[in-house]
């Protein structure tokens, strides 16, 4: 009969290995967290090198945390200790006492008594470890008496369910939407880019990208010739180009397509011209099924003319916001297909990091929160500033990424604080360059939807800039603690969005998936400014 372990025991010299081998083993994952020596991990079983029970229960009390993008996101940085089982040892001992009683009943010489004793056994709880006393008593005893499935079948079934759960967990939306391959449509989807972003009204159109080659999106026909307007299933408008004088909307509503009696072309005020064009837009239908897509990657603080856009003018939104119709962030983390491969981006050894804090800023404005916080932080720790304006110095010839890689920390300070507004300052300048980002933007919870919580430092975590400076100096003196901010690289890699090719292809992908569902944006400004 299998030996039951009741009272707590200590290792009996060199014989504890034999006792451990004879004891019923728990399933993988039922126990974890090897932290310290000399404590029993379970009543009746002495486990050398396991954590003490106070630490065990303290870690067990930590709530599980998850991330999301568009509601979900990357999994948080693994802390190095797996979750502990939530039951204390006293409760486990109380669960063993009925087991002893049931086994004594099974020794009855009467078959009927034995059957009643078998029926009185507690039912194994769903999800209980297969090697637990409940499973051993219920599952194995039933097999020996010809009741139930063979033990090998049970083990194989449990292994199959475990593999299925792990695959589902790994594949379920832990990251913002990635450019997965789309089914090839019956006919290519045409997407017309009305203005070249930041290129000016008279700039030559760029060659369209190959969506299949670059982003694994097939069935796209990217258009730049406005003569193909009637063939496009979607037309992409960049918001910044809407504010450059009277907008030349597509026909039949374009201002230049009407006489001066209909629209006064002398009016150069953007809001009045846009309102006039939108009034014309309601007079004639668009091509059937065509979607107008509003595209913007600036924050509401730097997006003029939002409130001048009439209701129902656009059908979709494309932006960094996770609740956009077409969500295209500045960057994201994706699971590494081969964990043994070197991490993406730059990760120079600590011996090559000669500086402490770096900051690259292109637009210096004393009114911005990031500049005010810099002045406070620079009083307690040295910050090397690169870029135009303020105390900035030119970026060295080796380039921005290699310059930042020489520093331990990078100030990923956004020019304004809005929902989901997390730009290349985090993804490219810090994470890809191999520096720990110190972020100032939306709150920490917003960042944790897209980035592991142990991959960055938020200014809101500290009551003052001096406290943050003290913590940065502490990490500088403790390399082992500093390296923890790079543990996420073992599981994830950084993707930097390719502007403007990737948004173009992502609109094509969205059209393929949307079907014929109609939609229009009733109040664009109220949605984007919240």
UniProtKB/Swiss-Prot annotation:
Membrane association type: Single-pass type II membrane protein
Glycosylation sites: 216, 315
Gene Ontology MF term list: 4-galactosyl-N-acetylglucosaminide 3-alpha-L-fucosyltransferase activity; alpha-(1->3)-fucosyltransferase activity; fucosyltransferase activity
Location of this chain's protein in the cell: Golgi apparatus, Golgi stack membrane
Parts of the chain on the Cytoplasmic side: 1-147
Keyword annotations from UniProtKB, A to Z: Glycoprotein, Glycosyltransferase, Golgi apparatus, Inflammatory response, Membrane, Signal-anchor, Transferase, Transmembrane, Transmembrane helix
Protein name: Alpha-(1,3)-fucosyltransferase 4
Organism this protein belongs to: Homo sapiens (Human)
């Amino acid at each position: 009969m299998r030996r039951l372990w009741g009272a707590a025991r200590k290792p009996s010299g060199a014989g504890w290995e034999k006792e451990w081998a004879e004891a019923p083993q728990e399933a993988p994952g039922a126990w974890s967290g090897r932290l310290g020596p000399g404590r029993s991990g379970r009543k009746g079983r002495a486990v050398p090198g396991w954590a003490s029970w106070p630490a065990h229960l303290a870690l067990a009390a930590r709530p599980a945390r998850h991330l999301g993008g568009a509601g979900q996101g990357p999994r948080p940085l693994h802390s190095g200790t797996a979750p502990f089982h939530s039951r204390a040892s006293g409760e486990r001992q109380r669960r063993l006492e009925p087991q002893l009683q049931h086994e004594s009943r099974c020794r009855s010489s009467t078959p009927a008594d034995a059957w009643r004793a078998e029926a009185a056994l507690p039912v194994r709880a769903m999800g209980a470890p297969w090697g637990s006393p409940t499973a051993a008593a219920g599952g194995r005893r039933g097999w020996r008496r010809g009741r139930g499935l063979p033990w090998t079948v049970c083990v194989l079934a449990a292994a199959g369910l475990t593999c299925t759960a792990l695959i589902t967990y790994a594949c379920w939306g832990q990251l913002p939407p990635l450019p997965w391959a789309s089914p090839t449509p019956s006919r290519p989807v045409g997407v017309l880019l009305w203005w070249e972003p930041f290129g000016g009204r008279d700039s030559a159109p760029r060659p369209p990208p190959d969506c299949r080659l670059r982003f694994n999106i097939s069935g796209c026909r990217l258009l730049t010739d406005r003569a193909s307007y009637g063939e496009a299933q979607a037309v992409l408008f960049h918001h910044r180009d809407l504010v450059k004088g009277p907008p030349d909307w597509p026909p039949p509503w374009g201002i230049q397509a009407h006489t001066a009696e209909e629209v006064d072309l002398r009016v150069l005020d953007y809001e009045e011209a846009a309102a006039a064009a939108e009034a014309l837009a309601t007079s004639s239908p668009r091509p059937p099924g065509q979607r107008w897509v509003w595209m913007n990657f600036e924050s509401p603080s730097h997006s003029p003319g939002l409130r001048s856009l009439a209701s129902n003018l656009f059908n979709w939104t494309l932006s960094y916001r996770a609740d956009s119709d077409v969500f295209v962030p500045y960057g994201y983390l994706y699971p590494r297909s081969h964990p043994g491969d070197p991490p993406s981006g730059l990760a120079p050894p600590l011996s090559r990091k000669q500086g402490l804090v770096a900051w690259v800023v292109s637009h210096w404005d004393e009114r911005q929160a990031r500049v005010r916080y810099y002045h406070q932080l620079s009083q307690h720790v040295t910050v090397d500033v690169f870029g135009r304006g303020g105390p900035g110095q030119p970026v060295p010839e080796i380039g921005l990424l290699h310059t930042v890689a020489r520093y331990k920390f990078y100030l990923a300070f956004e020019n304004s604080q809005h929902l989901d507004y997390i730009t290349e300052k985090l993804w490219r300048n810090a994470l890809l360059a191999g520096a720990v980002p110190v972020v100032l933007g939306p709150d920490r919870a917003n960042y944790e939807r897209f980035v592991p919580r142990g991959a960055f430092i938020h200014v809101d975590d500290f009551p003052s800039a001096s406290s943050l400076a003290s913590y940065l100096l502490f990490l500088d003196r403790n390399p082992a603690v500093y390296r923890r901010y790079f543990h996420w690289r073992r599981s994830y890699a950084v993707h930097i969005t390719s502007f403007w090719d990737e948004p173009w292809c992502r609109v094509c992908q969205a059209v393929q998936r949307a079907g014929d569902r109609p939609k229009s944006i009733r109040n664009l400004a109220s949605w984007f400014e919240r």
